[in-house]
Curated annotation (Swiss-Prot):
Alphabetical keyword list: Glycosyltransferase, Golgi apparatus, Membrane, Signal-anchor, Transferase, Transmembrane, Transmembrane helix
Protein's job: Catalyzes the transfer of alpha 1,2-linked fucose to ganglioside GM1 and galacto-N-biose.
CDD domains in the record: Fut1_Fut2_like
Species name: Bos taurus
Principal EC category: transferase
Catalytic activity, reaction form: a ganglioside GM1 + GDP-beta-L-fucose = a ganglioside Fuc-GM1 + GDP + H(+)
Protein name stated in the entry: Galactoside 2-alpha-L-fucosyltransferase SEC1
Amino acid sequence: MWDMRAVAPQRPAAGHPRAGWPRKLKTAATRFWATCPSSSTVCFLFVIFAVSTVFHCHRRLALVPAPWAYAGHVVLFPRHLPRGGVFTINAKGRLGNQMGEYATLYALAKMNGRAAFIPPQMHSTLAPIFRITLPVLHDATARSVPWQNYHLNDWMEEQYRHIPGEYVRLTGYPCSWTFYHHLRAEILQEFTLHAHVREEAQNFLRGLRVNGSRPSTYVGVHVRRGDYVRVMPTMWKGVLADRGYLQQALDWFRARHHSPLFVITSDDMAWCRRNINSSHRDVVFAGSGQQGSPARDFALLTQCNHTVITVGTFGIWAAYLAGGSTVYLANFTLPGSRFRMIFKPQAAFLPEWVGIAANLGQARESHP
């Protein structure tokens, strides 16, 4: 009889590992730890993953900000677009231009019975400052819509009351009260400052004094220079506000208000300090001087009682929101300027605003 123990290994008893198992386990564990990353490496990779995830989520959310920024929704797919037609508009220029584009879209869409949607770029510019309500049209949706471009002049025309087409993208640089002034209350509501933006501006103004006393009248002054220093004399045959204009504008308010305080904002504060007479001790150079961060300067201007502006849509919008009296630079281009073909002063400045003519002597010398 064969002794089976001599030809085959004996099976282990139930519930016990095979013979030699501890040695195999030790060998496997050794190989695992030899190839497995260290704990510090694992932690480092986890941090990289987390940071990358947050970064990309932030970029994604930048186009779809938190609900407080607007009351509408983000349209992701064409089937979500409302029936009856849609208006949108290009997002060109900086803050003042895009405010004009937004207000024009708001008014013309309502006038034509269309739904209005803004591009993400416009939302990114306006929503951090204002409590705008128009919904955002996602880029992926916009690319799949058969848009019909419709160019607008800078002022309202009768034909804009009946704009043809189902999906219309308005183009141009519209910024005129003639588009939207009949909806002034609604436009002011759209451009209501967020509470924290308004409170920061008001806290700054409350801390200002004229000869030791808190002023009863604040006059915001916006001096636009920047690229206009080059563009205005060469391209448009015009001039910017000079020392004489600013002196006349400030004196206009001094003659009508007791101890007003002038709050100066500008993209060239050094020029303002050299050219604005502050000997009356009623001038505060308050602006940041930074074009890239306009919210603070804009908020300061809108919280003042009255406004002095020079050129540009930034100042025009600040004056429109502030209310009160506004003094503006008038007749700042020569009669033959191409600027007069695309800009109508009577459509840019409200009728009750006060114009002070620019000194065109330098422009005439440059363009005889």
